[in-house]
Amino acid sequence: HPTYSPDMIEKKYVDAICRGEGEIYFLELIEKLENNEDFYATKNFWFKKEDGSIVKNPIGDLVNNLDEPPRPDRALMYDVDDSLRARGTKLFMATRGCPYKCTYCFNHAYNKLTKGHGDMMRYRSVDSVIEEIREVKDNYFLDRVNIDDDIFLLKPKGWLEEFAEKYPK
């Protein structure tokens, strides 16, 4: 993963990497490319120039409101991979982050990298998660929901109760 192994930019076949979250800055990069603007100063990105030099941009702000970014376009996976589409277990995320410093986990390094760029723990609303589950269920085979958070039980007060009430419906 380029966030933790940014030296992969030195590989012959790599021209750019995104470190950290990409939703905000990838869109910014695309807009700059579409408008023929200088894109080499896009936060979260490292670029390899034609002369081989590497531009290392700083980390930008984290996405604090996880309801804002568009949800993953699952058609990109499920419409091209029959085995993924047929698998009944689908993954969802309700939070990002973890406050703990377990030595075997990446989160302590990620928290150090992104310190000062936003809240360590970020959450989606229950309604947003339920809406995504419903959308997937309406379009794909779904018999098991896997909420793939780094730490599922660490939620704002009342979140789990609200989810437990709304999910069965």
What is each of the regions a protein language model found here?
Residues 67-169:
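Radical SAM [4Fe-4S] cluster-binding motif and immediate context
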